[in-house]
Amino acid sequence: MDIPNTTATIATIPQAPAGFRSGFVAIVGRPNVGKSTLMNQLVGQKIAITSPVAQTTRNRLQGIITTPSSQIILLDTPGIHKPHHELGRVLVKNAIQAIHSVDLVVFLVDSSATLGRGDRFVVDLLQKTDGPVVVGLNKQDQQPPDQREELNASYETLTENHGWPCFKFSALTGEGLSNFQSALEARLDPGPYYYPPDLVTDQPERFIMAELIREQILLLTRQEVPHSVAIAIEKVEETPERTNVFAAITVERGSQKGIIIGQKGSMLQAIGTAARQQIQKLISGDVYLKLFVKVEPKWRQSRQQLLEFGYRVEE
């Protein structure tokens, strides 16, 4: 994976040819509609973590798609939901801000389910933006065959009422995404390269490492633990033989620490093994991963601790 160094890579940004299109595209929607899966498929490699747990995405992550004719910068935003703590409020605020700071918005829905209250809440937000909106009917592969026509029609009626074009695809299988990507490109104005052509994300390597560790916690632990977890990469050591990564897992309660560690350390070992394998894929080399767990009560309610964990917190 090509990881950015902003000051070092500015000189490598070429001049765009005539007719080149570029712009920023926010992917928004309620939790668990497949925003991160869509980002990974369009970019062509895994830069955003995925899991069945709602609010998996916490930071606004950019994925960069560069072709000979365009550069599309995708913003994978946290799922828009009713927040219950300071972290949740920060996540939703960041997602809403993205709607008003991009050239195009993709409103992503789970077309295998009926239109819900969460989707309608996003629709209400999108009505307040002046920019163009397209709708992605994701999870076409998961629609019950006998309900496909009815489900698609309900979403198409909604989008037609607002003048938003509608596209059907499966982010999981990739079916329909080629046409969708072409549609995004066609809706962008002529513009420059914003990033070097070989870059796929704006996030540093340590951020991706931390997210890969958090992903395994989301996948392997109980429902009550994932939302209370934060990861900090304390140190990365490069040696000729391998990369040594030291990471702290922060939870809010001692009981959650016990769940993360598991009986005789079994859960922590499972998390570490799975995360190490993913990090090795990321950096294409051998990795030693050392994890330790600590308790910080109510860290999600603390603006200072949210800042320390790298979340965008604005007044």
From Swiss-Prot:
Gene Ontology cellular component annotations, sorted alphabetically: cytosol; plasma membrane
Domain of life where this protein originates: Bacteria
G5: annotated span: 169-171
Pfam families from the UniProt entry: KH_2 (PF07650), MMR_HSR1 (PF01926)
InterPro entries for the chain: G_ERA_dom (IPR030388), GTP-bd (IPR006073), GTPase_Era-like (IPR005662), KH_dom-like_a/b (IPR015946), KH_dom_type_2 (IPR004044), KH_sf_prok-type (IPR009019), P-loop_NTPase (IPR027417), Small_GTP-bd (IPR005225)
Compartment(s) where it occurs, according to its Swiss-Prot or TrEMBL record: Cytoplasm; Cell inner membrane
Residues that hold GTP according to the record: 29-36, 76-80, 138-141
UniProt region (G4), positions on chain: 138-141
Domain Era-type G: 21-190
Segments of this protein annotated with the region G2: 55-59
Chain ranges of the KH type-2 domain: 221-297
Lyase as UniProt keyword: no
Region (G3): 76-79
Region described as G1: spans on this chain: 29-36
Topological category with respect to the lipid bilayer: Peripheral membrane protein
Job of this protein: An essential GTPase that binds both GDP and GTP, with rapid nucleotide exchange. Plays a role in 16S rRNA processing and 30S ribosomal subunit biogenesis and possibly also in cell cycle regulation and energy metabolism.
Family statement: Belongs to the TRAFAC class TrmE-Era-EngA-EngB-Septin-like GTPase superfamily. Era GTPase family.
Subunit structure, interactors included: Monomer.
Record protein name field: GTPase Era
Gene name linked to the record: era
